[in-house]
């Protein structure tokens, strides 16, 4: 015997929430793939300075997002199917998966908040090392290529006024061309541009995580209510 009355409304409401959850998983997967192949981050994080690669902390987070998006799509489908079939087993499995996902999201959120400045800090240190080598050593072609990629990708020059002045006088070719020698001095500080690059992307990820967390809370409540309704309807 199928559920009736308010429980039936909850059944279809849960289906709608799961469909939205499935779509959210697809959006997160798409955003993660976009961040993974974004020309700005890709051109910077694929660089190597000698035998030292660029920091990969950002990409570790992206790979986690890709996995989360794929799992969300699977769990959303499981919830939709369980709600339509009125299966306590599927709904129980769905609830368990949601609890695990929610716990992982909270843990990832805490880790992200604690390390939110570390990604940009690592990239800035990598840039500073390359800039120092490029300015001090005329034969450091690898370092020059790294610095030039940063400057052209972010449209910046130097990490502070002194470094920018030194770079302008000694290595003007490292900065984006602008027609005169003062142009690099007027361009934005590279540290600031690196902060803007990663803070904007982390802000986008944070908004997506909050929206998904709210949906998950509603889904856990609705799935338990529907499970109880299915159990009660089978008694009568």
Curated annotation (Swiss-Prot):
The record marks 116, 144, 148 as: Important for interaction with integrin. GO terms for molecular function: cholesterol binding; integrin binding; MHC class II protein binding; transferrin receptor binding; virus receptor activity. Induction: Up-regulated in response to notexin-induced acute myoinjury. Keywords: Adaptive immunity, Cell membrane, Disulfide bond, Immunity, Lipid-binding, Membrane, Transmembrane, Transmembrane helix. It comes from the Eukaryota. Disulfide bonds join 156-190, 157-175. CDD domains: CD81_like_LEL. It holds the Pfam family Tetraspanin. Structural component of specialized membrane microdomains known as tetraspanin-enriched microdomains (TERMs), which act as platforms for receptor clustering and signaling. Essential for trafficking and compartmentalization of CD19 receptor on the cell surface of activated B cells. Upon initial encounter with a microbial pathogen, enables the assembly of CD19-CR2 and B cell receptor complexes at signaling TERMs, lowering the threshold dose of antigen required to trigger B cell clonal expansion and humoral immune response. (Microbial infection) Specifically required for Plasmodium yoelii infectivity of hepatocytes, controlling sporozoite entry in hepatocytes via the parasitophorous vacuole and subsequent parasite differentiation to exoerythrocytic forms. Belongs to the tetraspanin (TM4SF) family. This is CD81 antigen.
């Amino acid at each position: 015997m199928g559920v009736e009355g308010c429980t039936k409304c909850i059944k279809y409401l849960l289906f709608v929430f799961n469909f939205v959850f499935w779509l959210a998983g697809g959006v997160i997967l798409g955003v993660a793939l976009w961040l993974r192949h974004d020309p700005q981050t890709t051109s910077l994080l694929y660089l190597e300075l000698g035998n030292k690669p660029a920091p990969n902390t950002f990409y570790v987070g992206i790979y986690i997002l890709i996995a989360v998006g794929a799992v969300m799509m699977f769990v959303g489908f499981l919830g939709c199917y369980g709600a339509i079939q009125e299966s306590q087993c599927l709904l129980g499995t769905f609830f368990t998966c949601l609890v695990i996902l929610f716990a992982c999201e909270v843990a990832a959120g805490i880790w992200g908040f604690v390390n939110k400045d570390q990604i940009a800090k690592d990239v800035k240190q990598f840039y500073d090392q390359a800039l120092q080598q490029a300015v001090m050593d005329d034969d450091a072609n690898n370092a020059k290529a790294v610095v030039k990629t940063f400057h052209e990708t972010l449209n910046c020059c130097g990490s502070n006024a002194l470094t920018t002045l030194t770079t302008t006088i000694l290595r003007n070719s490292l900065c984006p061309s602008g027609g005169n020698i003062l142009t690099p001095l007027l361009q934005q500080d590279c540290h600031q541009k690196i902060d803007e690059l990663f803070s904007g992307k982390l802000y986008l990820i944070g908004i997506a995580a909050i929206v998904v967390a709210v949906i998950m809370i509603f889904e856990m409540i609705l799935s338990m209510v529907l499970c109880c309704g299915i159990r009660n309807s089978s008694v009568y």
